[in-house]
Curated annotation (Swiss-Prot):
The lineage of its organism: Bacteria, Bacillati, Actinomycetota, Actinomycetes, Bifidobacteriales. This is Xanthine phosphoribosyltransferase. The keyword Oxidoreductase does not apply. Pathway: Purine metabolism; XMP biosynthesis via salvage pathway; XMP from xanthine: step 1/1. It is found in: Cytoplasm. Its EC number is 2.4.2.22. Belongs to the purine/pyrimidine phosphoribosyltransferase family. Xpt subfamily. It comes from Bifidobacterium longum subsp. infantis (strain ATCC 15697 / DSM 20088 / JCM 1222 / NCTC 11817 / S12). It catalyses: XMP + diphosphate = xanthine + 5-phospho-alpha-D-ribose 1-diphosphate. One of its GO terms (cellular component) is cytoplasm. 5-phospho-alpha-D-ribose 1-diphosphate binds at residues 129-133. SUPFAM superfamilies: PRTase-like (SSF53271). Keywords: Cytoplasm, Glycosyltransferase, Purine salvage, Transferase.
Length: 193
């Protein structure tokens, strides 16, 4: 998605440790118009799929997923919680994921009543690095017996291999911008096309 690549080039900052900071428009301050165009792009890509639910992980994927849901007939959006809460009652699906950004493992939880065997799920997230967060969402879907119809990603760090691994496993991964390389010294960002 050219517009997203341009925003990354003009407003993104490359940090040490393979970190790409895009908080001006994606995961701190949210450009809802951009999110809308991202949702439209995913709707075009996944047009042949019967999506009944969107699943993401808190927190940065929530805004993108909610706006994207409008392009899929306003299907429900479920977000996996990263911690146990008194608001989560009853049966739940739980798995553990490793966060590249936070450099730690944490549990992710979805109430069983919100993820079912009949669901055809589109996974959406802001970033895809090594694929650990998505692997956790896939595990939750498998536990529920839900079908993963596809994966929509705003920014994939292609050099970290998570997207390539998921594609090799047969998942339909649509990343709107794939960063091929980043240089924290020069700030240079190159994209895969």
């Amino acid at each position: 998605m050219q517009e997203l690549e341009e925003r990354i080039q003009s407003e993104g900052t490359v940090k040490e440790g393979d970190v790409l900071k895009v908080d001006a428009f994606l995961n701190h301050q949210c450009d809802v118009r951009l999110f809308d165009r991202m949702g439209s792009a995913w709707a075009a890509h996944f047009a042949g799929k019967h999506i009944t639910k969107i699943l993401t992980i808190e927190a940065s994927g929530i805004g993108i997923a909610c706006v994207a849901a409008q392009h899929f007939g306003n299907v429900p959006v479920v977000f996996a919680k990263k911690a146990q809460s008194i608001n989560l009652d009853g049966d739940q699906y739980t798995t553990t994921v490793y966060s590249f950004t936070k450099q730690k493992e944490f549990p992710v939880i979805v109430a069983k009543k919100y993820l079912n065997a009949g669901d055809h799920v589109l996974l959406i997230d802001d970033f895809l690095a090594n694929g650990k967060a998505l692997r956790g969402l896939i595990n939750l879907c498998e536990a529920a017996g839900a079908t993963v119809e596809g994966i929509g990603i705003a920014v994939e760090k292609g050099f970290q291999g998570g997207g390539d691994t998921l594609r090799a496993e047969g998942y339909d991964v649509d990343s709107l911008a794939i960063v091929e390389s980043m240089n924290p010294e020069t700030g240079e960002i190159t994209f895969r096309h």
